């Protein structure tokens, strides 16, 4: 079902988070067609300090302004760079320093787009906010549920799992019922400047730079040895923070005597010894886990876990739903999967679903081996 349109007797004021992309542009158009009083707001979340617009903020603002001018709505601007640094970026650095691989987009949604932006919009007198995320919401039995977007290729519920039901209840998601080609068609129909603009990829504050170059500005590299599972030293790494579980590219391993031609993969980041443990083969047994542990789960709405519960989960964006059993333990939460899960990565998020309902999720802290023989 589509997000509810306002009644004739109550014209609600909605402020749309305008990113300068096609999804938020079309969101504004759809809300206007539904009769809302629509305004836009452009958020700047990163201060470029090197004279180069890596985040393309200037270009994105110009595109957002062009769209707002075209459809005849006001565009506000807000700078949340301080909030982003304190609540997102510093955590991002701490996670890498601890050897984990974080996902800043999830924290950005919780702390910036559905907190700082929401608070700012309410201060401006908005009744609701709206974003161009491919998700849906449903109001039922006095609570608001977060649902997967209708387009399985674009569903973004994975990234919004840490946003609470109260925030979801104040948000409209106009493109959540649409598929991407439909969104672009609407943009072209209305002559929007963003109709053919490419989707943004990667982390905003890194932009076009190489990730290793960016991270090196903030964290000192700590080179160490690359070892096989048998303990043989076969190379050196420039820093564990530059690598992630399941990584194949950029290891600099090759031409080893008596080794097969199978590619090498990162299996373990040994923080205690600053060693990168690698193995050959896409299906190396050390790459697979049967369970994971998270100490804290952010629920969209509270759920009953007085006994183990059958759900599905994703351990990465765009992964298919994986059947699992979730249980509350003394140390947090443990999800046991029906099938082996490849490259379960501490620092990334596990997100739980009940059908199309996104229940919530948490940061992966421990990935348990698929078999007891896999001594990591």
Swiss-Prot record:
GO molecular function, one term: tRNA binding
GO biological process: tRNA wobble position uridine thiolation
Region (Interaction with tRNA): 154-156, 316-317
Location(s), subcellular: Cytoplasm
Keywords: ATP-binding, Cytoplasm, Disulfide bond, Nucleotide-binding, RNA-binding, Transferase, tRNA processing, tRNA-binding
Enzyme Commission no: 2.8.1.13
Plastid among keywords: no
Main location: cytoplasm
Catalysed reactions, as listed in the record: S-sulfanyl-L-cysteinyl-[protein] + uridine(34) in tRNA + AH2 + ATP = 2-thiouridine(34) in tRNA + L-cysteinyl-[protein] + A + AMP + diphosphate + H(+)
SUPFAM superfamilies xref list: Adenine nucleotide alpha hydrolases-like
Pfam family, one: tRNA_Me_trans_C
Catalytic residue list: 108, 204
GO cellular component labels: cytoplasm
Main EC class the enzyme belongs to: transferase
Disulphide linkage map: 108-204
Keyword Cell division (UniProt): no
Region described as Interaction with target base in tRNA: spans on this chain: 103-105
Annotated positions binding ATP: 17-24, 43, 132
Site (Interaction with tRNA): 133, 348
PANTHER family on file: MITOCHONDRIAL TRNA-SPECIFIC 2-THIOURIDYLASE 1, TRNA 5-METHYLAMINOMETHYL-2-THIOURIDYLATE -METHYLTRANSFERASE
Family to which the UniProt record says this protein belongs: Belongs to the MnmA/TRMU family.
Function (record text): Catalyzes the 2-thiolation of uridine at the wobble position (U34) of tRNA, leading to the formation of s(2)U34.
This protein's name: tRNA-specific 2-thiouridylase MnmA
Gene name, Swiss-Prot/TrEMBL: mnmA
